[in-house]
C-alpha cells in the first residue's frame, strides 16, 4: 500500500472481529467526520431549537446568557499585610529617659506582705528583680519589716462567724391544738337546738312507732303509750354508800333476790324494741285483714 493514500491525522484502530461487528450498531462503528470537535451543550441545543417550542417573539429573540460562576471572596489582607499583622512586633528597647518596668513577682510580694525577705543570692540571680526592689514605685507604700508583718499576720485573726440562730420550734400546745377554719365554727345555741330537735324526733318516732299522727289517733294513742312504757329511764335513783351501821347490817342481812330487786333496771335494747314494734305493727295488720276476710 503506498504511503500517499494514508490520511495524515488518521489513527490506526484495531480491527473488530466479524462476530462483534454484527452485534454492535452501525452508528457506533462510524467515526465522526470532524474528528475531535466539541459537542454542543444542552443550552446551545435548546437555543438552536427555540423557534420550535417558543411562541413569544420577545423570548425567541432574547439570548440566554451562560451562568456566571460565583465570585470568590476577596481576602481581607494581602499576603504582605497578613505577614505584617501576624508577625509579632519587636519591643522597643527602653531608652535612657524611659522608666524600667517592674517585675510582677515584686508587686505580688509587696501586696501579699510575704514573711521571708528576698535573699541576696536570689537578688543577684535576678538583676531585674533586684533593680525593681531598689526602685519601688512612688504609689506603692514602703514594705514593712518582716517581724512586724509576721506579728501582724499572727495578731490579726479572722472574725468568728456569727452562729445561725435556730428557728423557734412551735410549742406542744400549739402543735396539739388543731386550728379550725372559721367557716365550721358554730355557736352553742345552734348545737343545743339541733340536739334537742333530734331528741324530739327520736322520741316522737318511738312513741308513735313510726306511724303518722292521723293513723296513731285512729288506732288509739293509749296502746302506743302502753307499748312505749316498756323503756325504763336510766336516770333512776343512784345507790349511795350507806353511812350508818344500821344500813350496813340491813344490807348484809338481805338475800340475793332482794339485791336483784333493788338494782336499777336497765332499759330495753334497741333490737328488742324494734322487734316489739314490728310484732305490734304485724298484729295491727292481721287485725285489719281478718274482718275484711270474714265479711
Curated annotation (Swiss-Prot):
Transmembrane parts of this sequence: none
A single Gene Ontology CC term: cytoplasm
Endpoints of the signal sequence: none
Keyword terms of this UniProt record: Cytoplasm, Cytoskeleton
PANTHER family to which the protein is assigned, alphabetical: AGAP005440-PA, PROTEIN FAM110A
Protein name as catalogued: Protein FAM110A
The species this protein was found in: Bos taurus
Locations listed in the record: Cytoplasm; Cytoplasm, Cytoskeleton, Microtubule organizing center, Centrosome; Cytoplasm, Cytoskeleton, Spindle pole
Main location: cytoplasm
Family, similarity comment: Belongs to the FAM110 family.
Amino acid at each position: 500500500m503506498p504511503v500517499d493514500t494514508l490520511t495524515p491525522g488518521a489513527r490506526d484502530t484495531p480491527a473488530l472481529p466479524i462476530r462483534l461487528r454484527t452485534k454492535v450498531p452501525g452508528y457506533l462503528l462510524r467515526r465522526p467526520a470532524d474528528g475531535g470537535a466539541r459537542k454542543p451543550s444542552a443550552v446551545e441545543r435548546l437555543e438552536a431549537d427555540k423557534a420550535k417550542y417558543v411562541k413569544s417573539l420577545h423570548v425567541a429573540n432574547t439570548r440566554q446568557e451562560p451562568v456566571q460562576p460565583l465570585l470568590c471572596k476577596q481576602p481581607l489582607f494581602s499576603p504582605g499585610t497578613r505577614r505584617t499583622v501576624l508577625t509579632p512586633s519587636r519591643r522597643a528597647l527602653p531608652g535612657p529617659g524611659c522608666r524600667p518596668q517592674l517585675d510582677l513577682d515584686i508587686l505580688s510580694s509587696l501586696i501579699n506582705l510575704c514573711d521571708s525577705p528576698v535573699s541576696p543570692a536570689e537578688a543577684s540571680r535576678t538583676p531585674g528583680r533586684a533593680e525593681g526592689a531598689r526602685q519601688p514605685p512612688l504609689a506603692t507604700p514602703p514594705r514593712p519589716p518582716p517581724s512586724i508583718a509576721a506579728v501582724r499576720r499572727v495578731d490579726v485573726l479572722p472574725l468568728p462567724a456569727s452562729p445561725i440562730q435556730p428557728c423557734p420550734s412551735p410549742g406542744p400546745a400549739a402543735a396539739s391544738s388543731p386550728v379550725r377554719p372559721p367557716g365550721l365554727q358554730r355557736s352553742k345555741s345552734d348545737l343545743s337546738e339541733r340536739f334537742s330537735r333530734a331528741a324530739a324526733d327520736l322520741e316522737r318516732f318511738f312513741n308513735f312507732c313510726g306511724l303518722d299522727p292521723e293513723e296513731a289517733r285512729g288506732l288509739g294513742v293509749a296502746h302506743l303509750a302502753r307499748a312505749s312504757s316498756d323503756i325504763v329511764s336510766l336516770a333512776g335513783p343512784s345507790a349511795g354508800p350507806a353511812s350508818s351501821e344500821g344500813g350496813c347490817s340491813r344490807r348484809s342481812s338481805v338475800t340475793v333476790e332482794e339485791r336483784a330487786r333493788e338494782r336499777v333496771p336497765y332499759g330495753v335494747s334497741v333490737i328488742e324494741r324494734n322487734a316489739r314494734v314490728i310484732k305490734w305493727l304485724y298484729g295491727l295488720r292481721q287485725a285489719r285483714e281478718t274482718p275484711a276476710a270474714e265479711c
